[in-house]
Amino acid sequence: MRNYRNYITVLLLSALLCSCGEYQRVQKSDDYNYKFEFAKRAYEEKKYVQAATILKDCVTVFKGSEKAEESLYLLGMSNYENKDYLSSGSYFKTYYTRYPKGKFAEDARFYCGYGYYLDSPDPQLDQSGTIQAIEELQAFLDYFPRSDKVSIAQNAI
């Protein structure tokens, strides 16, 4: 029983070290398609910091290509999931400005405003962030009045 537990521990540590090694290889790689696939997998595995770091490189390189839209959206979502709402809002705003009819436009508008809402300060502090959240959420409601996220946006406002 004890050997079995030691075996499991060694196996888990090996897997952890291999995944760290892969991340380092990806960061040094010049193959941006490989980086993009790794970033998507990291995002799916909830490794948002790794995904965001890799996607920052990909967004610049993929600008004007068919992967540009998805990489920019995933960069915004990685920052959002990592609770970096100001950065995510900036990426989402860039997304819906570049791709107003893109396949992630609705989510980008929503998460931009909702992220600013989540980042809003206490009432006794400067409310410029709150005003920005209200403006973004209202724009979301104006653009997507039939969205399934309408009630969430209305409650936040």
Spans of model-derived segments:
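Bacterial N-terminal signal peptides
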Residues: 9-16
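Acidic, polar-rich low-complexity tracts and alpha-helical solenoid repeat scaffolds
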Residues: 2-4, 16-157
